[in-house]
Regions:
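Active-site proximal loops enriched in glycine and acidic residues that flank catalytic Cys/His/Asp
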Residues: 313-316, 351-353, 383-385, 405-407, ...
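Hydrophobic alpha-helical transmembrane signal-anchor segments
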Residues: 3-40, 49
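Intrinsic disorder and flexible/low-complexity segments
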Residues: 304-309, 313-343, 461, 533-588
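Cleft-lining beta-strand/loop regions that shape enzyme active-site pockets
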Residues: 50-171, 300-424
Length: 588
């Protein structure tokens, strides 16, 4: 009897603890949802003679990001600036009589070159309305400075710094490390320039990869330097001389003498500049409106029109399943659902991806073809910083493809990469294997080197994937297979060159794609935008994914900018290891 009561009390205690924990979790979820809702519904008023303040810090994202429960609970919420909201706010501010000008507060933005170019172009259009832009920084990163050159005047702290250095790329190579630990990487590929596998095979860049990097980095820098020169009223030779001069070491007086900046002043002194520019009383403070607050005001007023354009965001690595990036098991149903929505008049796929799983890329491509054939509605692609390899695969069938001049695209090639750990097991830790099989046709595994027959079969598998990739591109672009092969071979192209060789139709951002589609729909000033995937907070999904997200977050936080290499290595060795992705590089 005593044992019975002990067991019963233990069970009751377990029930009460479970109830308490679920109740606590529910309270936390309600708090998170309430805080999120409150932040979304924060409204501000815009007085006359106001200044739109754009703070270049944190991270620029293509769109507003979904709620991350771990960030909400810990308070670790990095500042994010959705590019689409920023551009819409700048365009509206150009016609808003209450906004006199823009103040760029530069504090080290994290963004891709295509994002920065799109933002800068929006600022240039703002100036064309006759309004002014001023920029200030204690320290200008090169990205900050590129955007700031759209301003009428560039100010800097008297003991500040400006870093203009051109572009360089850095790649880590692991061949010697893998040799030391006894891991061999077995690679089968198609494409002379398909360099994504090189970090596992070589200790330095191949001649072909060096050649392609020099080409696209040079073209991208020429575009950036040209815009900087245009903004500062100098020639590109002057900008290149700045990039060769270690500008970070120059005194601000020298920066002004070289016309890199206009004036030196402390931050508080910019208040007087802005008060004078907005014609306020001398003892007034400038009337600042933060761009995110301003964008929130616009979002409450927009989405009215007879036509609806769907913008579907495809961002990250392409895989078959998972919680992050572009997964075919989530994106394919989304595309097919859009094909059935009668209130959607056109689709723009916004791609920011260096590729991934070839199988998943094909499934997404096919779903988009279904959208076209079932609806007959216009379908465009807008490329972000990168839409290469698998990112180009899912893009190639669009009616029109848009890219920024500095977008990285192309990389039409395929590879398979399978690690062989038998030396690690045998020689390093003394583990041996023995395999008994009924037949020879096994897929290569991690525990043994590929046999000649397996390698031949893998090469045939990769060749077939490459031929299909090329065929998809040729059909989508309306050209011959041979013409695609001439520019394929895994080569990465900058957007400007891609437009010249037929991989891209128009140079411009998402705003241009929207304007062109609206014109095609005869709805230039009468359309609304619906964004997908839906970002509504689903707390049950967050709870279910919390454990896996935490594990991935810890590993990838430690790896930092090299986390993508970890993800690629993790995917290899599976049957879906046929990859169409470009190399991971860090561009400085």
């Amino acid at each position: 009897m005593k044992q019975f009561f002990v067991s019963m009390l233990g069970a009751l205690a377990g029930i009460w603890i479970s109830v308490f924990l679920f109740g606590l979790l529910g309270i936390i979820m309600i708090g998170v949802m309430a805080a999120t809702s409150a932040s979304d519904n924060t409204m501000v008023t815009v007085d006359s003679n106001s200044v739109l303040r754009i703070t270049l810090s944190g991270e620029i994202t293509d769109r507003k990001q979904p709620v991350n429960i771990m960030n909400e609970l810990t308070g670790d919420k990095p500042k994010q600036y959705p590019l689409n909201m920023m551009i819409a706010a700048i365009e509206h501010a150009a016609e808003d009589d209450d906004i006199d000008g823009i103040f760029l507060d530069c504090a080290g933005i994290s963004a891709g070159m295509a994002q920065l170019q799109a933002l800068r172009q929006a600022l240039v259009r703002f100036k064309e309305s006759g309004k002014w832009i001023y920029a200030y920084a204690d320290t200008y990163s090169q990205g900050d400075y590129f955007v700031a050159t759209a301003a009428d005047s560039i100010f800097i702290n008297p003991i500040g710094m400006a870093d203009i250095h051109g572009l360089s790329s850095t790649t880590l190579y692991f061949k010697d490390m893998l040799d030391k630990i006894g891991v061999d990487v077995q690679v089968v590929k198609v494409g002379t320039y398909k360099s994504a596998v090189e970090p596992f095979m070589l200790n330095q860049s191949s001649e072909a990869n060096t050649r392609q990097q020099q080409a696209y980095l040079g073209n991208i820098w020429n575009e950036i330097a040209g815009k900087i020169a245009e903004g500062r009223g100098v020639d590109t030779a002057a900008v290149n001389s700045w990039a060769d001069s270690f500008t970070f070491s120059l005194e601000t007086s020298e920066l002004a003498a070289r016309h890199i900046v206009d004036r030196t002043m402390y931050r508080h002194e910019t208040d007087k500049i802005l008060v004078d520019a907005t014609r306020l009383e001398e003892d007034d403070d400038p009337r600042m409106v933060d761009i995110l607050d301003y964008a929130t005001i616009l979002s409450s007023k927009k989405n009215h029109g007879d036509k609806t354009i769907a913008v579907l965001y495809a961002v990250g690595d392409i895989t078959e399943s998972g919680n992050d990036g572009i997964t075919s098991d989530r994106l394919v149903p989304q595309i097919l659902d859009l094909a059935e929505e009668s209130d959607i008049d056109g689709l723009i796929l916004r791609v920011n991806s260096g590729g991934g799983c070839a199988y998943a890329s094909e499934q997404i491509w096919e779903a988009l073809e279904q959208f076209k054939s079932l609806t007959g509605k216009p379908y465009y692609v807008s490329m972000g910083d990168v839409a290469a390899s698998g990112g180009y695969y899912i893009s190639c069938g669009a009616d029109r493809i848009y890219a920024e001049p500095v977008t990285l695209t192309g990389s039409i090639g395929i590879f398979g990469l399978i690690p062989d750990a038998h030396r690690l097991l045998n020689d390093k830790i003394g583990v041996h294997t023995s395999t008994v099989a009924t037949n020879r046709g096994q897929f290569p595994g991690l525990l043994n080197a590929m046999t000649p027959d397996q390698r031949n079969a893998m090469q045939s598998y990769v060749d077939r994937g490459y031929e299909l990739f090329v065929k998809r591109c040729a059909e989508g672009r309306g050209v011959s297979v041979d013409s695609i092969k001439a520019i394929a071979e895994g080569r990465v192209w900058d957007g400007l060159t891609a437009s010249r060789i037929g991989l891209v139709d128009r140079l411009g951002g998402l705003d241009m794609a929207l304007a062109d589609m609206a014109a095609e729909l005869d709805a230039a000033d009468n359309y609304k935008i619906k964004e997908y995937p839906d970002l509504k907070f689903k707390w049950w999904e967050e709870v279910l994914n919390m454990s896996s997200n935490m594990k991935a977050s810890v590993v990838e936080t430690e790896l930092g900018q090299y986390a993508p290499l970890y993800r690629m290595a993790r995917e290899c060795g599976h049957l879906s290891a046929l990859q169409c992705r470009m190399e991971y590089i860090t561009i400085h």
